[in-house]
């Protein structure tokens, strides 16, 4: 399969140039509010009060393994993958589970997961490929499964700071997950994070359900 320039640059960044810097930065990032929202929806739709091993979470583009580890510690069964070899190795060591080295489209799951967590990962997929990518990942969800994704807020598409980014707006995510990928939008919201350089990064988040 021919890889795009954006994909190759992004993998070079994660595999060679900034691996350790990225890991250290993301391990410090606090996404607990969105993660807790996601967990609440997974439990509600599974009619469970607490996490258990019979609830399966897929961490799609797990990066450092930060959230995979939290899901495991809370009691979920978790599968995780990332396209970066270096991050897969680091995340496997950090989480204690084997992290699969795979792109979104190379995964081969069907009706296996109660939730998919794609925190700041789908933002590396070109806009023209997002419908196919989300539709492919959606197949991994059980009926009524929950899908979370986050993107940097905006309309930018291209190489930024050595990686490809596809930014998004609430309107676009509503169209992508709701109209194009035929999921039920449960929440669509914006939040902010403080970057290491002291600046503020705005994010858009979507939580959707497979019907």
Residue ranges, per PLM feature:
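Class I (Rossmann-like) S-adenosyl-L-methionine-dependent methyltransferase catalytic domain
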Residues: 1-108, 125-132, 136, 146-211
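Active-site charged/polar residues at nucleotide-handling catalytic sites that mediate phosphoryl
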Residues: 111
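Conserved acidic residues
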Residues: 114
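A conserved beta-strand element that flanks and buttresses the S-adenosyl-L-methionine
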Residues: 117
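Short catalytic micro-motifs in class I SAM-dependent methyltransferases
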Residues: 120-124
């Amino acid at each position: 399969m021919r890889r795009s320039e954006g994909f190759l640059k992004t993998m070079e960044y994660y595999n060679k140039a900034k691996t350790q810097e990225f890991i250290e930065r993301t391990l410090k990032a606090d996404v607990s509010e969105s993660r807790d929202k996601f967990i609440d929806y997974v439990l509600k739709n599974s009619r469970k009060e607490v996490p258990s091993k019979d609830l399966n979470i897929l961490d799609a583009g797990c990066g450092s393994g930060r959230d995979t580890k939290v899901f495991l510690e809370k009691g979920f069964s978790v599968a995780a993958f990332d396209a970066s070899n270096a991050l897969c190795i680091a995340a496997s060591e950090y989480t204690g589970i084997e992290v699969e080295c795979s792109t979104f489209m190379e995964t081969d799951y069907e009706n296996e997961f109660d939730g998919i967590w794609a925190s700041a990962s789908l933002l590396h997929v070109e806009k023209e490929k997002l419908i196919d990518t989300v539709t492919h990942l959606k197949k991994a969800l059980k009926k009524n499964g929950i899908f979370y994704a986050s993107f940097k807020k905006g309309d930018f598409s291209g190489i930024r700071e050595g990686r490809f980014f596809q930014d998004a707006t609430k309107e676009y995510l509503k169209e992508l997950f709701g109209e194009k990928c035929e999921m039920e939008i449960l929440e669509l919201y914006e939040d902010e994070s403080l970057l290491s350089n002291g600046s503020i990064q705005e994010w858009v988040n979507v939580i959707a359900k497979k019907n």
